[in-house]
Regions:
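Polytopic transmembrane helical bundles with strong interfacial aromatic enrichment
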Residues: 1-231
Length: 231
């Protein structure tokens, strides 16, 4: 999008087309909400540390930790929604990447969602997997019916189109990076809900272990973001 091939290299033809294409818009919104999530969680972590060590500013940082919890929850919801729509776009624009994210080797209709898998790139299948039936098709098509193309078929298509070569990404890395990202997101929502509830009920100081844990948990959004960039 927004480029032409000239003398064996890509040259930009339209900056506007480049910055407004669907792929960029999907990633921009996903990244924006990830930033909001990170900011909210960092505010919670810093506020927890201040609540433990600065008793004179207790009211201010109680309000701050509630605001951080709200920011985190809003951010994660935005990440999930933008990620969902971007996933559906990837099914058309970058099906190999999508199939690798889910370790889906064969084209299936409906396609299951693998909760856990041990991908074997040499043999082109999963040596072990635990799946949820229909779930991957629902993610891609918003329906229990719909084909999702698998890695092996996409590899054959790529060879026919571009010539011999291995066009598969590192399936194991993509598969588990995606799950680490998603798992971190849901973990942050859970922590935020607990923090907000306790702060709202004025019971935050009865959960000292949580306050002590929060500064250490500040790494979670950065782990999620790093895994997201790998994906």
């Amino acid at each position: 999008v927004g480029y032409t091939l000239a003398n064996g290299r890509a040259e930009m033809a339209s900056f506007f087309d480049l910055v407004t294409n669907h792929y960029i818009l999907g990633e921009q919104s996903h990244t924006l909400f990830a930033g909001i999530t990170t900011a909210g969680f960092v505010v919670m972590a810093v506020s927890a540390w201040k609540l433990l060590h600065d008793t004179e500013s207790r009211y201010a940082f109680t309000q701050a930790i509630k605001a951080g919890a709200i920011y985190t929850m809003v951010g994660v919801v935005g990440v999930i929604l933008s990620g969902h729509f971007h996933t559906q776009y990837l099914a058309q624009a970058s099906p190999m990447k999508l199939a690798a994210m889910e370790a889906l080797w064969e084209t299936e209709d409906p396609a299951p969602f693998a909760v856990v898998a041990y991908p074997n790139m040499e043999k082109g299948h999963n040596d072990f997997e635990i799946t949820i039936p229909y779930m991957f098709t629902i993610m891609v098509h918003d329906n229990i019916k719909g084909e999702v193309r698998g890695i092996n078929d996409l590899q054959k298509e790529a060879v026919e189109k571009h010539g011999p070569g291995d066009y598969r990404p590192h399936v194991t890395m993509l598969f588990y990076s995606f799950r680490a990202m998603v798992g971190s997101g849901f973990f942050m929502v859970l922590v935020s809900l607990v923090v907000f509830y306790l702060a709202k009920k004025d019971k935050l100081f009865s959960a000292k272990k949580l306050l002590y844990a929060l500064p250490w948990l500040v790494v979670v959004p950065f782990i999620a973001n790093s895994c997201g960039w790998i994906v």
